[in-house]
Amino acid sequence: MDINITLIGQMITFAIFVGFTMKFVWPPLRKALEERREKIAEGLASADRASRELEVAKRQSAEILREAKAKATEIVENAYVRAHKVDEQAKEEAIAAADKIKSMAIAEIEQEKVKAKEQLKQELVNLAMAAASKIIAASVDEKASKKVLEDFVEKV
């Protein structure tokens, strides 16, 4: 095995090349690899954080939705209760108005009844006076008196 100068030259050149690469090429390459590893780790951490935040947001949105549904149900129930109260109040007012009208009608009927009785009494008095004066005028004839009284009774 002959070691000649070419082989030694190649070994020296290779050693210089390795030294040059270790000094000038390897550090930026290592730095780039390290930066890439950090970016990947940061991306994974960011994705993990985003996943957790998404989970929290989902829980919060579900809670907000639940609260909104509960509030909507409460509003509907309150509206139903209020409508029922208004309905009952309207019914009570209508019944009160009907009772008032009925009472007024009954009072008016009673007044008309009293008035009619008074008129009837007045007419009865007038008829009795007329009959009495006819009886006195015709007191001579008993038959005529009887007839006048019968006519009077028929009128009444």
Swiss-Prot record:
Source species: Francisella tularensis subsp. tularensis (strain SCHU S4 / Schu 4)
Pfam families cross-referenced by the UniProt entry: ATP-synt_B (PF00430)
Signal peptide feature range: none
MF term (GO), any: proton-transporting ATP synthase activity, rotational mechanism
Chief location bin: membrane
Family: Belongs to the ATPase B chain family.
Record localization: Cell inner membrane
Superkingdom in the source lineage: Bacteria
TM ranges: 5-27
This protein's name: ATP synthase subunit b
Keywords: ATP synthesis, Cell inner membrane, Cell membrane, CF(0), Hydrogen ion transport, Ion transport, Membrane, Transmembrane, Transmembrane helix, Transport
SUPFAM superfamilies according to UniProt: F1F0 ATP synthase subunit B, membrane domain
Any one annotated GO CC term: plasma membrane
